[in-house]
Structures are given as C-alpha cells and as structure tokens.
Amino acid sequence: RPGGMLMNGIPSFRLEKDVVDAEIDILRELGVEFRCGVEVGKDVTIAQLREQGYQSFYVAVGLQSGGKLNIPGGDADGVMAGIDFMRQVNLHEKKTLSGKVVVIGGGNIGADVARTAVRCGAESVDLYCLEAYDDMPMGEEDRSECERDGITVHAGWGQTEIVVEDGKCAGIRFRKCTRVKNDEGRFAPEFDDSVSEQAECATVLYCIGQKVDWRELLTGTAVEFNPNGTVKADPVTYQTAEKDIFVGGDAYTGQKFAIDAIAAGKEGAISLHRFVQHATLTVGRNRRQFIELDKENALIPVNYDTTPRQRIGYNEALRRTFSDERVAFTEEQIKK
C-alpha cells in the first residue's frame, strides 16, 4: 500500500491511518498512479523507465533499515529493530507481545515503539537510553506520554550483551554511561564498567539509528553518496549528480521529522516541473536561510503576555488503545 513511513512507521495512535488514506485518495483524484510491490532496480530499472518515457525521478525511500544490534546475542530470537516491529504492527502481521519488553533508544521512535509495545500486551515495558533524562532526544510530551502509559525510563545506560537461553532472549545487560558527547559535541559515549545493570525480558526492541537500504535502486547511475549512506544533492533543488534524478526526505538529510520530508517533497516537485520544462532550477527558489533569534539578548516588553503554553487533554476511554487519545483544546484554553 502507498504511504511509506506515515503508514508503516508511525503508530496509529500518533497518526490515524484514515487521515493518510484520505490524502492518498486526493492524489489519486489528481491523476497520480501508484504502483505498489515494485522494486526499482530489480523489477524495473531507471534506465528502463527512461525508455518508457519518464523524464525525471524523485527518490524518497526514507530510512527503512534498523540495522543490527552489534552486541553479543544481538541475533537471538526476540531481538528486533524497532522500525521492523512498527512495520509488522502497522501491517497487522504482529499484534501481540508476551512477557517483559525492553526498548533501547531515547528518541521519538523509541517512545513510539515503547508505547506500541504496551498496546500489544507486554507484561511491562522498560526504556533504556544513553542520555541523561533531561537530555533525551525525545520531547517533553513524549516523556510524559511514556510515563502515562506506565513505561519505566532508565536514563544513562548503554547495552553490552543480550542474555540468551536456548537461542531466545532472556534478558539484557547494561553499563553506566557517564558521557554521550565529547568536548567538540560529537557522539563519543564514555562508560563506567564498574556500574552495571541487568533487565529480565523476552523481547528487546532497539531504536538506535536507521539507515537507507538502497539495494539496486541507483545501480548504474552517477549518483554520489555520503559516508552515512545518504545521497549527495543540491541543498536547494535536490538535484543529484545524475541530472534527471532528484532526492529528498531522510534519504538525503538523514533522520528528521515527517514534516521535513513533506516540505522537501514540495520543493522537489518544483524542481521536477522545471526540469521537464527545461527551465532554470535555481531562480526564485527559497534558499531556507534563517537567522536564529538570540533569545538571551531579546528585549521583552514589561507588558508582554506571559500566559504559559496550553497542554492538550486526553480521552481516558481511549487510553492504551491504538486510537488517538489526544483531544483538542477546550474553549477556555483557547480564550487564554
């Protein structure tokens, strides 16, 4: 089915699928044809598509691979990439979990996976991450919703080994993480091996970074790649070294939000249109260059409205279900 990560990677309690289906139906009405189950590079090549009359291509395959958990026992039964778990749940291939579950990763995806595991019937869900609690990549709302769902967060731990019994996951060991980044701000975690912890569990779902699985998609093209597997392209037009191939979304930027990929798609559409019309790709384009506000030195008037940010409510009847439990602001909140 069409929809990509919006359909297969994001839980329905975060983004209900009928919303995406409605948007896809609009595209169909506009004349867009969807061909699902086709692997470009294997079933058909870009060269063959050119022969069929296609003049330009936009590649937005995202970061579909969760990689491997490179620790002893990482290939045991019960150990799975979080993105693969989400795909199985959204495609209705997996709806139930039993026993205790450990989720590795303190980002937004880790939160989604942990909350989904709760809804799949896990006995308990514990989330471990390298960062200190206040430094976790996931936002404040995600942390609050994890706690609301009964998920226990263990901040400042790095996985070392899966405990395996009869080929199956029986637990996982951690060591204390004392530092995540070095003085230059680069990812270089440091650990205290004298402080360890072991968690009993039947399932480990790891969310520690995703990557692009290109397979044979761009074989035979002049497209160039970055060391992390993303594609090199013009930052304004998204044109690659292969002039009729454009790229966008996470396959170009690395892991970002869905809304960033959607915005890139709109700019990519402009480039595709100009390319097939033999027009300039650069004149009049939004270069997306912004100057960050220096909040520390901003002059705030004495009468500035200091009303705090309003928080959403929840429908208790939908708690721990796959329906979106969030509710709109009340009239009183809007008046504030």
Regions found by a protein language model. Name each.
Residues R1, G107-I109, A251-Y252:
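Residue-level detector of alpha-helix initiation sites
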Residues P2-E29, F34, V89, A114-E161, ...:
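Rossmann-like dinucleotide-binding cores of NAD(P)H-dependent redox enzymes
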Residues M7-N8, V38-V40, V44, L97-S98, ...:
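Ferredoxin-like iron-sulfur electron-transfer modules
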Residues D21-I71, E161-R173, T178-K181, C201-L205, ...:
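Feature captures the FAD/FMN-dependent oxidoreductase FAD-binding
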Residues D25-E39, G66-C120, F225-A241:
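Glycine-rich dinucleotide-binding loop and its adjacent helix/turn
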Residues D77-S98, I162, N182-Q255, I300:
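FAD-site-proximal beta/loop scaffold in flavoenzymes
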Residues R148-G150, G158-K168, V180, R274-K336:
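Mid-to-C-terminal Rossmann-like scaffold of FAD/NAD(P)H-dependent oxidoreductases
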Residues G248-A279:
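A conserved FAD-binding loop/helix module that cradles the flavin
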